């Protein structure tokens, strides 16, 4: 288009070119047995294992995107209605149902999350954020991916 505007050429020589189609990769998925192994991989004897199990339960139980998960606040969860309010793509609010295992895992995590602060285990820098890192701040999408990879290895799911 630049050469046409400058009068160097009259016709765009690329108009009749056909671009090659790039095959899309199929998304990575887990079978039910593998999902169960993954969710059971975090140790429930350590505080971050409890947090990580809650993360995995919510990811599996709701189908929430990682970017949405890291932006969750405690107030986004309605335990009575068994739902999570999510601010999704394009700032659109979505309501996702919570499974009973997800609710139990979140509740157990929240009990332990409060104990962390009492024991000065972490500083609560982000009191509203649902899932905290070891410094008391909001987890990032990258840290969630690291958590998933860590437990996939522990569960023997190295595909």
Task: List the model feature ranges, each with a label.
Residues 1-159:
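Conserved catalytic core of the tyrosine transesterase superfamily
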């Amino acid at each position: 288009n630049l050469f046409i505007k400058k009068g160097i050429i009259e016709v765009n020589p690329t108009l009749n070119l056909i671009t090659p189609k790039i095959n899309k990769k199929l998304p990575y998925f887990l079978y039910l047995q593998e999902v169960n192994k993954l969710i059971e991989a975090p140790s429930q004897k350590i505080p971050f294992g409890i947090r990580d199990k809650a993360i995995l339960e919510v990811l599996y139980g709701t189908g929430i995107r990682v970017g949405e998960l890291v932006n969750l606040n405690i107030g986004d969860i309605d335990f009575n209605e068994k739902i999570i309010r999510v601010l999704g793509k394009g700032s659109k609010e979505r309501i996702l149902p919570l499974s009973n295992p997800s609710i139990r895992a979140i509740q157990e995590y929240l009990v332990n999350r409060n104990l962390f602060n009492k024991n000065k285990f972490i500083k609560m820098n982000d009191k509203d954020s649902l899932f905290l890192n070891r410094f008391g701040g909001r987890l990032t999408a990258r840290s969630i991916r690291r958590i998933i990879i860590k437990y996939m290895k522990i569960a023997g799911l190295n595909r």
